[in-house]
Each structure stands twice: as structure tokens, then as C-alpha cells.
Amino acid sequence: MAIFDNYEVWFVIGSQHLYGPETLRQVTQHAEHVVNALNTEAKLPCKLVLKPLGTTPDEITAICRDANYDDRCAGLVVWLHTFSPAKMWINGLTMLNKPLLQFHTQFNAALPWDSIDMDFMNLNQTAHGGREFGFIGARMRQQHAVVTGHWQDKQAHERIGSWMRQAVSKQDTRHLKVCRFGDNMREVAVTDGDKVAAQIKFGFSVNTRAVGDLVQVVNSISDGDVNALVDEYESCYTMTPATQIHGEKRQNVLEAARIELGMKRFLEQGGFHAFTTTFEDLHGLKQLPGLPVQRLMQQGYGFAGEGDWKTAALLRIMKVMSTGLQGGTSFMEDYTYHFEKGNDLVLGSHMLEVCPSIAVEEKPILDVQHLGIGGKDDPARLIFNTQTGPAIVASLIDLGDRYRLLVNCIDTVKTPHSLPKLPVANALWKAQPDLPTASEAWILAGGAHHTVFSHALNLNDMRQFAEMHDIEITVIDNDTRLPAFKDALRWNEVYYGFRR
């Protein structure tokens, strides 16, 4: 995905006319230098665009108003180069509906000990200008991020870049359309929820489309297009004998390709970037979409099974966040456990739909195997193991009065044995701090059995996501202890109860 090319972040300098035109000229000069350097050297995901100085209430209000109405603007980075009285910012910040980051930096890194004078002090006032800006943010109860560090510092670059990913993701989410092919898996609770509340909170819309409408598009795909896509399969994957030309399951592969092309066309025509399916609503489809869903996820689409629109939306959001980063992000499900003293493990998978972006194999296996659930023809699927190393699993749940994001930090490990009779992609991990604590905390907090699994993102990314969307986050990691975790759940209940 080249989604960051569609957005820019505005760089706004706060000052005032008290210091005279020469000081403001130097402020502008410094700002131009910093923005050019950051765009050239900081490896930021999208471009910084310098805006005119904000030196009066009207100028600041105009910048904020323009940011709201510019679809390319993903957010504002504000630098208080000099002191900028914060009452000037009230009207602008009141109307601002884009993410905001305060870059608490200054042009010089070291103090010029021998030459420092009051002119230098008046020009370089971030130390207390930033505090004035911080006060008005706190007074207005306005969520904004703060990054402190010199503008040439790589850690500051990384933090700004991480925030930019969140800002772009938030703007993308406001336009996100989730398509549900069929409804919720019958009688399942956690995959359901309030779609109106979700659209109010996050911006994404969720609507159902009839499977019959999808089938009509699938059936319109030409044999030539199907054969061309299967040629791509053969170059990208290791085909089992049954799936090769003249193999007994070759027709199933052709049908999977037809479904993939039909699904993609349907999603593109409807402007959808996330979708769900359910094995209980497949009328007219010859097989449960496995391979098609896997490949669409790898192309950046959000997905979840059984009508789970919240996880599908979260996957799309996290796909956008992680664009260009190392490691993959996938739909996942905690499936079964391996209990062994000191080596408890979780085997994650799903019936078919795990994204190849997390595969360790360069060429996953493409196979067709029997699947009793759904009552359709044997579906095609990609089979692979997962990369090892630190990862997270995240779940977004609807508690009725609010949304809760659960994040468990995990360590993925190599599968110690082959799985000859398990023809699905899988991931094996150790939950932090340990399986009993992690699973009990997850259950107590109401976490879903569906998650988004990511090697590319980390806990800090998800904390930023929760803060930017003003939702509760519950963390399970090596520092988690159940008594304190239970207390935190109780405190959160009181805190969010007061905010209703």
C-alpha cells in the first residue's frame, strides 16, 4: 500500500509579535531548515509541510480551520519556538479535529555558553513556551501527543514517525467501509456489537451485502482472468501435486481464483477496505474463501471470520499503521494450548484465513484439503509457519458503554514438530508473562477469541492508537500481576463511568 503518499502533516510554529520582526524572521528560517532536514533525513512515513507562523489568534484559528477541511492533512505538529501565549490557541484548538503532536525541541542542541545573551534566550524559548501550550491542552482536556528531543535526534524521528502512522491511520479509518458478506455467526456474542456506536467513535461504517450479490460478480469473472491468476499462484507458491495441472484438486484452485477476483472486484466497486465472511452463509459459493481471503489480507484488506466486523476493521487499521515496516500483520485466533511446565504454548490459527505477510517461508504451500465446516467443496489455502520473535495480539471489544482494546505481548517461537495432519497456516507463541496469567487476565477483561496478530507493531503503537481514539486499553505483558490487573479493571470501570 502507498497510503502515506495520500497524506501530509502540517508543521506549525507558534510565536508572537512581542519579539519584533527580526526574531520572527529567524524563527521562520529555523523552521524551514528543520522541516527540510526532517523530510530529507528522518525517514518519516509522509511529508511535513511548513505552514505560516501562528502569531495571532486569527492566524492560528485559520490554520486549524484549514487543516480540518484539507483531506490531505493527517494532523498537525506544533513547535513553540518562542513563547506563544496559549489563549491565542483556544479557538483554533477548540475546532481542530485532526491529531495533534507537540514537538518539544529547539533549534540549537548545545547552549553557546560564551555568547548566550537575552536575544538568544528570547529566540529559543521552547522550554517554557512548550509548557504554556501544554497547560492549555490540559485545561481544554484535549488529547495530544508530546515528543521531546532535538530535531536531529533519531529517537525523536522514530517517535514522530510512529505518531504520523497513527495520524494517517485515523484519517483512513474515517473513510473505512467494512463489508459483511452475510451476518454474524449465529449465537456468538463477542463478534457482534453496536455498529452505530463504532461509527461515531472511530468513523468506519459497517454494512451487510448479500452473498448472492457477491456470487453474481464471482460468476462474471472470465476464464482468462482466472487462468492468469492461477499462473501467478504457480510462481508465488509451492503447489502440491493435487493442485497442479491434471491434479485431482486443480478445479478447486481455479474456483478459489475466481472467488478471489470476484471478491476483489466487489470490494473495489463498493469502496470497501475490510470485510467479513461466515461459514454459515455461503449460498452460491462453491467453497469457503480461504486462499482468496489470505491474499486479500496480504494486499492490505482487513478481514475477520464469522461476521466479526470489529476485528476486520482493527486489522485494516493496523495494516495501515504498519505499512512499510518489517514484519507482518494478520487475522488470528487463539486455537489450542500446549501445557508443559515452564513451556506453556498457544497455537494460533483459524480454519483457513491467516495472512501470508507473517509467513516464515518465502513460498508457502498451496494445497486443497477437506473442510467439514460450511458443507462446501474442499477449499484452497496457503499453509505456512510464522516468523519468530516479539509480537502482539490485540482485540477490540464492545462493552456497551465504551470500547476496550486488549493487548497481550507475546513471543513467537519455532514449531518444535511438523504438523502433517494440520493443513492450515499457524503461529506458535509464549504469552507474557505466562499462559495462566495471560489467559486469566484476557478472560477477565472480556477479550475476544479473534485477534489481530502483528510482528510489525508493538505495545507503544497500540497505546498511541488507544489514546488517539480516546478508548480504554488493557495491557497484558511481563509486568502483569493478576491482583493489580483486577484492580485496574475496577478503576477503569469507575473512571469511564464518570465520563459517560
UniProtKB/Swiss-Prot annotation:
Listed Gene3D superfamilies: 3.40.50.10940
Top-level enzyme category: isomerase
Entry's cofactor comment: Binds 1 Mn(2+) ion per subunit.
Family annotation (InterPro entries): Ara_Isoase_C, AraA_central, AraA_N, AraA_N_sf, Fuc/Ara_isomerase_C, Fucose_isomerase_N/cen_sf, Lara_isomerase
Pathway linked to the protein: Carbohydrate degradation; L-arabinose degradation via L-ribulose; D-xylulose 5-phosphate from L-arabinose (bacterial route): step 1/3
Binding positions (Mn(2+)): 306, 333, 350, 450
A molecular function (GO) term: manganese ion binding
Alphabetical list of SUPFAM superfamilies matching this protein: FucI/AraA C-terminal domain-like, FucI/AraA N-terminal and middle domains
Leader sequence segment: none
Entry keywords, A to Z: Arabinose catabolism, Carbohydrate metabolism, Isomerase, Manganese, Metal-binding
Keyword Protein biosynthesis (UniProt): no
GO biological process: L-arabinose catabolic process to xylulose 5-phosphate
Keyword hit for Magnesium: no
Reactions mediated catalytically: beta-L-arabinopyranose = L-ribulose
Enzyme Commission identifier(s): 5.3.1.4
Cited function: Catalyzes the conversion of L-arabinose to L-ribulose.
Family, per entry: Belongs to the arabinose isomerase family.
Subunit structure: Homohexamer.
Protein known as: L-arabinose isomerase
